Amino acid sequence: TEAKVHDSKAMKKFPYEPSAYYIFDRGYNDFKSLYHIHLVKAKFVIRAKNNLKYKAVKWKRRLPENVLSDSTIELTGYYPHKYYPEQFCLVRYWDGQQEREFVFITNAMDISALQVAELYRNRWKVELFFKWLKQHLKIKKFWGTTENAVRIQIYAAMCTYCLVAIVQK
């Protein structure tokens, strides 16, 4: 999307597929869209906003290392609860490398809290890869929207980057 388009607006146009996982950052806390993902039988993991209002209805007592809590919750804010009436999971995770806590919400009730944290960590690796692409390969935006078009543009930029590095030596 263009930089001026808010992430949650772009989220509404995305074609969600059943059984797929969608990993979002805090900018995507749009409970109407998250409920749509849930209804198409897809899964999401999203960083929770600090002001999330909820009520815990169930807790897991035995927690693996770095998992601070793993609970089933319901939203208590009027509109959030109206837009997402189902329960989902809230995971509090301590990242020892960054020395900070992350809070995730997910409708993937069948995976562990550590798997939730790992899914988000992998999303962050993708963010870092795209940051590297922008800095080193000078890709400002993608010309096409299909997977093949994006791959071709990335491969062409990587080849150009390598050729320039060889010539400079």
Model-derived segments and their meaning:
Residues 1-169:
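Single, function-defining residue in the core of a domain
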